[in-house]
Amino acid sequence: MNRGRGGFRGGRGGRTGPSQFQQGPPDTVLEMGAFMQACEGDIVCRSINVKIPYFNAPIYLENKTQIGKVDEILGPLNEVFFTIKPSEGVKADSFKEGDKFFIGPDKLLPLERFLPKPKEVGPKPKRKSGGAGGASRGGFGGRGGARGGFGGRGGARGGFGGRGGSRGGFSGGRGGSRGGFGGRGGSRGGFGGSRGGRGGRF
């Protein structure tokens, strides 16, 4: 996993938390998101938690019934959205707008983990001369990486990312806003697009 400027590269399959083999629900759960709409079988949520969920973190109802796992994290750092891949037998369109989903407190990361670190005050270390193929701009990877958020695999810098084209989202076309969260390749476009199409407009 490569971490870009204050974020992760890779809209999916990132960190899953310290315990990948947890059995049963946690002792307590915290509010994580509110249902917005179903999109191609997934649940699209607006985050109502100040922290960022782990990828693949289990998501529960208030009664601790697991309904799926975090699939993708999207949007700018000050307005985070995420999708849930429903568990077998759970229908994304069975929920209504405003329904809340919950997460275990051990599956959250502080937002500060994804913000740029302050510049160090003091003399700069001397660079060694010579050598081919040095690190670029601090050695944080190339195009498609995150700048202040989650960057997608070959996707946009921030903004909303998707899987090979429009899949319903908020911003379309190439790129998106810097300092956000992206998915896998391409742009997730405006909510209500079809996979492989062009992204929507604001």
Swiss-Prot record:
Gene name of the encoded protein: GAR1
Gene Ontology cellular component terms for the protein in this record: box H/ACA snoRNP complex
Cell location: Nucleus, Nucleolus
Function according to Swiss-Prot or TrEMBL: Non-catalytic component of the H/ACA small nucleolar ribonucleoprotein (H/ACA snoRNP), which catalyzes pseudouridylation of rRNA and is required for ribosome biogenesis. This involves the isomerization of uridine such that the ribose is subsequently attached to C5, instead of the normal N1. Pseudouridine ('psi') residues may serve to stabilize the conformation of rRNAs. The H/ACA snoRNP complex also mediates pseudouridylation of other types of RNAs. The H/ACA snoRNP complex mediates pseudouridylation at position 93 in U2 snRNA.
Keywords (A to Z) from UniProt: Nucleus, Repeat, Ribonucleoprotein, Ribosome biogenesis, RNA-binding, rRNA processing
UniProt name for this protein: H/ACA ribonucleoprotein complex subunit GAR1
Keyword RNA-binding: yes
Organism: Scheffersomyces stipitis (strain ATCC 58785 / CBS 6054 / NBRC 10063 / NRRL Y-11545) (Yeast)
Stretches for region RGG-box 2: 137-200
Major localization class: nucleus
Family (UniProt): Belongs to the GAR1 family.
Transmembrane segments: none
